[in-house]
A protein has these predicted regions:
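Consensus "Asn ladder" position of solenoid repeat domains
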Residues: 91, 114, 134-137, 157-160, ...
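Bacterial Sec-dependent N-terminal signal peptides
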Residues: 1-19, 133, 156
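Leucine-rich repeat
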Residues: 72-74, 102-105, 124-129, 146-152, ...
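The feature encodes a structural signal of leucine-rich repeats
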Residues: 96-101, 119-122, 140-146, 165-168, ...
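Conserved hydrophobic beta-strand positions in leucine-rich repeat
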Residues: 78-80, 109-111, 129-134, 153-157, ...
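N-terminal capping/linker segments that flank leucine-rich repeat
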Residues: 13-98, 206, 214-243
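Ankyrin-repeat and related helical/solenoid repeat scaffolds used for protein-protein interactions
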Residues: 156-159, 163-203
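Extracellular repeat-rich scaffold modules on cell surfaces
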Residues: 90, 101-109
């Protein structure tokens, strides 16, 4: 009786959400609440629902896709790689909707092993993003104003079809890891040597801070990169991960 009474009180009074948030206390196991209650930001949910819809993924609602971590009602981390296990998606993601730009509190995005060919212009809104893993897709490029992702620390673009990098990449002052191996790059912006990246070293887990092997770089290569001990490094696509 006490539990039933508490539930009724919660639903009628305590658990009402602020405007713009939706209450849901029946969550699947793939949802992690890092901090907060069961109120979820509507715009974040819209981005998830649109991602499901445009790719014809078989999920009942926005909470079904991937592994999601929420912080005070905002989507903080989304793991939606096509790994072939329950941590990612149950089918391939081919495109990202403009509404992913709603995820303005997102800090980690994992989209490996899909078939994504481009990033929507709204991607520039993800200013809190610290980790972007989108290897093993079919990206031909990235957003021009990449510097809008000013908090980016980890950027994995390996195993795509990228043929050119925007100059704006040089303004990513917080970037520590940059993986560009196995793309179609034939040239690089000269300003890359102004970036605060350790071009030749590995971290404590033996991952290189920078790697760019498997491209078509032959001439007009910035000196910091041509002299890098990791110039020809390419990690095995089936075994590496920062996760």
């Amino acid at each position: 009786y006490i539990l039933v009474l508490f539930s009724l009180i919660c639903e009628s009074l305590i658990c009402q959400c602020e405007e713009g948030f939706t209450y849901n206390n029946t969550l699947p196991n793939n949802i992690n609440i890092l901090l907060g209650d069961s109120c979820f930001y509507n715009d974040d949910l819209e981005g998830l629902a649109d991602l499901i819809s445009i790719n014809n993924l078989e999920y009942d609602n926005a909470f079904g896709i991937g592994t999601q971590s929420w912080f005070n009602g905002r989507l903080k981390i989304l793991v939606a790689g096509n790994y072939g296990n329950i941590s990612g998606v149950n089918d391939t993601i081919f495109s990202l909707p403009e509404s992913v730009g709603n995820w303005t509190s997102l800090s980690g995005l994992y989209l490996e092993w899909n078939r994504i060919s481009s990033l929507p212009s709204s991607f520039e809104n993800l200013k809190e993003l610290r980790s972007l893993y989108i290897s093993n897709n079919i990206l031909e490029g990235v957003i021009e104003n990449l510097d809008s992702l000013s908090n980016l620390k980890y950027l994995d673009l390996g195993y795509n079809k990228i043929n050119q990098l925007p100059i704006s990449i040089c303004s990513l002052a917080e970037l520590q890891y940059l993986w560009l191996f196995n793309n179609n790059l034939s040239s690089l912006p000269d300003c890359m040597c102004d970036m605060n990246i350790d071009w030749s070293s590995d971290d404590s887990a033996w991952f290189p801070f920078f790697a760019i092997g498997g491209n078509s770089l032959c001439e007009n290569i910035p000196e910091c990169i041509s002299n890098s001990e990791n110039f020809n490094v390419s990690l095995d696509q089936f075994y590496y991960s920062f996760q």
